[in-house]
Amino acid sequence: MKYLFTATILVLLTPAGIIAQTMDTGVHKILFLGNSITYAGNYITDMEAAYTLWHPERRVSFINMGLPSETVSGLSEEGHAGGRFPRPDLHERLHRILKAVQPDIVFACYGMNDGIYLPFDQQRFQRYKDGMNWLHDTLVKTGARVIIVTPPVYDELRAGATGYGAVLDKYADWLRLQKKSAHWEVADIHYPMKKYLDAHRTLDAAYGVDGFALAADGVHPGEAGHWIMAKQLLLYLGEKKAAGYQGIKNIMEQHSNGAGILQLVAERQNFMKDAWLTATGHTRPEMKTGLPLQEANTRALEIGRKITALLQQ
């Protein structure tokens, strides 16, 4: 019964308000900016795998430049990471990223870390708004299509920072308002994730259990959470067929080599994100050193040929 409930909710999460904007055929590079949730990259892998299966004739690079702990507000809580280092600030590295990648589309998802896990404060909120305005303006000047993504949901039951869920609601609401007031492109993942979480909590309460978590630690989504993110962004890009699928595995099952294609896409994503981060530089310690970018690109091309071969079988 719970599986049926989950499947039903995943289908119902397709918001009627999403306006499909099919991706232009001239798009070759999609850049993803964000924090540790983006760095984990499952939603990017899901998007790339689905897009590859649906558009085998296209060659689009999904470039993950997420950096754990990062903010656009420039704020960092006292004792962050056990006092080992402050949160990195996107201001320090964005110009290098844009010069190196020269993207056609940019998805930017910030907010989870920007309130630094404290109750709502107008000054912190202003720092977030200032950071997002700077980010949007900087990206627009490059000529890229800019899609701002609302922050994922925060689960207070699992994470423990009481009131922080409401903080992210405010941050997401402000971003959504920019669609009308500033004519931004804004893709909402916050409220679809919140709707899914609330529905499961209602079911848990009805059965007297406390078993569901969209993110085990309340912050970093698991497989279902990343799929909700991927699904909303695919729909935003005009991929209407994403609405009917409960997860990436259901999509890949439509091809006899789907599982192998997904595995190769994930493998390529995992080494390319570290190669890009190392090549463009950042201030966050304790990160894996990536392959030299030229070596990583050569390896990525080899994987691309394998994917093409599997698609044609």
What function would you assign to each model-found segment?
Residues M1-L4:
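Positively charged n-region of N-terminal signal peptides that target proteins for export
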Residues T6-A16:
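Bacterial N-terminal signal peptides
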Residues I19-S69, S73-S76, R84, L94-Q102, ...:
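Serine-esterase "nucleophile elbow" of acetyl-processing enzymes
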Residues G26, N42, A182, D204-Q313:
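Conserved catalytic region of serine esterases and O-acyltransferases that act on ester linkages
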Residues L33, T45, G74-E77, R84-Q126, ...:
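Oxyanion-hole/transition-state-stabilizing segment in secreted/luminal serine hydrolases
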Residues S36-Y39, L67-S73, I105, M112-Y117, ...:
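Solvent-exposed loop/turn segments at secondary-structure junctions
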Residues V140-R145:
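A short helix->loop->beta-strand "cap" motif at the edges of active sites that frequently abuts
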Residues E156-Y191:
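Substrate-gating cap/lid alpha-helix
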